Amino acid sequence: MEKPRPRGHSEMMAEASRIHRAAIVIDGHNDLPWQVRSLAGSSFDNMDIALPQDKLQTDIPRLRQGGLGGQFWVVYVPPATAHTGTATAMALEQFDLIHRMVKRYSAVFEMACTAQDVVRIHKDGKIASLIGVEGGHTIENSLDTLARFYDLGARYMGLTHSETIDWADSATDQARSGGLSTFGEQVVLEMNRLGMLVDLAHVSPETMHDALRVSEAPVIFSHSSAYAIAEHDRNVRDDVLRLVANNGGVVMVNFFSGFIHPEGAALTANCFQRERKLKADHPDEQEFERARQQWKEAHPIPHGNVGTLVDHIDHIVLVAGIDHVGLGADYDGAGTMPDRLEDVSGYPHITQELLERGYSERDIHKILGGNLLRALRQAEQVSGKSGG
């Protein structure tokens, strides 16, 4: 049920629109590159995102409607590639795809490697395109590969995805190191030296604690929300939120209804483990997809709405403070999204909801992108001091 709208709703809508246009709206996580690989053979001739794409949550017309000023495009490859020795090679293909996308649509996108790049590109009316890597399995235990990824534009890396790796435990798999191994700590320090943000979105609570203890620069959660609101292991507990505040980090809220709606979180709490079992029971890819789809149809996730999402922002602000929250939607990487946030055109609705809840223009700008820019600047400063 929609909550009652305040008096002067049209005036508030106009004010929200003005605030949104003035902000640098930065999203921490978009999986469009993997969708282009999966659905279009990595070809923008086959999937021209300058045109509306009904199979996607992301295309250029809707990015413009959403007022995006900066986007982290994600280098994702399945965790299983770590077992076949193909993770790094496939990740490099995804880097190439992102660079080809930015070059092809150069009137819209421009690569950004620093916080100042983001500000400049936004001022020029383009969407600053940054790169995040989803999962430390992609470096195949090589610090040289990590540095190579940085040189290719990566400005954050998630320490794990859904599976535990040799040096870091995942939130959704069995523990192996009890957090970070000694080499895992070396990875974090090397990321600090390079100026690459440490992303804790998929890691276990123990890994979070270890990384926050070791890191000399702010960490981020590129697409995670508040555990106190929706109890899912992909979300962040209050004790960690307090540590993030001390660290200067940013929790960028995920929009996926299965992570932010309390009932949705209960349904998806064991989603990664369940999918691994389904794959074991159905080794044929088509059979697996059929079984997966049947389960989803039998267990629909409640959508929630913009307010459901902003409840997470409210909680993170309450526990960690206004300087430690941002947006990391996970478009084209997740399923059910809240009403009015079905695709990348919906960001202005968040600004309106924040304004209606009493957030100031200054604080809204922090949430929409200012906090992430500040964390990136601090990571750059730490790198500069260490000779990175």
Which residues fall in each region the model found?
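N-terminal hydrophobic targeting/anchoring segments and the immediately downstream early-domain regions
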Residues: 1-178, 231-388
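Histidine-centered catalytic micro-motifs
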Residues: 26-32, 203, 221-225
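Short, contiguous, pocket-lining structural segments
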Residues: 176-183, 199-207, 236
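Substrate-binding cleft of carbohydrate-active enzyme catalytic domains
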Residues: 187-200, 206-210, 240-246, 315
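Short, catalytically relevant binding-site loops at active-site mouths
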Residues: 205-206, 226-228, 257-260
